[in-house]
Amino acid sequence: IGASIIASDASFAFGAGLVTIVLQNEKNIPCHIMQSKSVSDNCTAIALGMGLGEIESLKLEEILQLNIPKVLDADIFYNPLIVKYLDENVVLTPHPKEFISLLKLTNIANISIEELQENRFLYVEKFCKIYPKVTLLLKGANVIISQNKNMYINTFGSQKLSKGGSGDILTGLISSLLAQG
């Protein structure tokens, strides 16, 4: 739940307005974040995956089927259900280990971290060629952002961003932008 709170706080701070965490059981969360057992009908964007752990496949599929912008992160990259939703406009924010899992789930490659790190651009290009609607943001020392045939590299990374929670903040910021249109 901590990762979800971090992402929600970031989304709220970045201007998303009403932010809700979907939980099966009520938890003690900050008062500016709502909680619900289901996704609201007026939801304009979803961030999914942080602290996901073991969620019922039916519930996960129900959320993934919603026709609203999504940013997917963390545990979602280990769930085979994700493959069904890669043909739509979605933002993915994996770190290298999560991207390796995604490559394996999509049958693109079964590689090691070392192989990925040596050929990051190649595997990003392969993935985005097969899934051109996906916006992929591969985290690392130099973040690679790619969609279809376009690829951008952010060379302004910092060791300070390799701390736990920084990816959750990034997911919250992206979901806030998606929610605001």
Regions found by a protein language model. Name each.
Residues 1-71, 76-91, 96, 100-181:
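Small-residue (G/A/S/T)-rich helix-start motifs and N-terminal tracts that mark the onset
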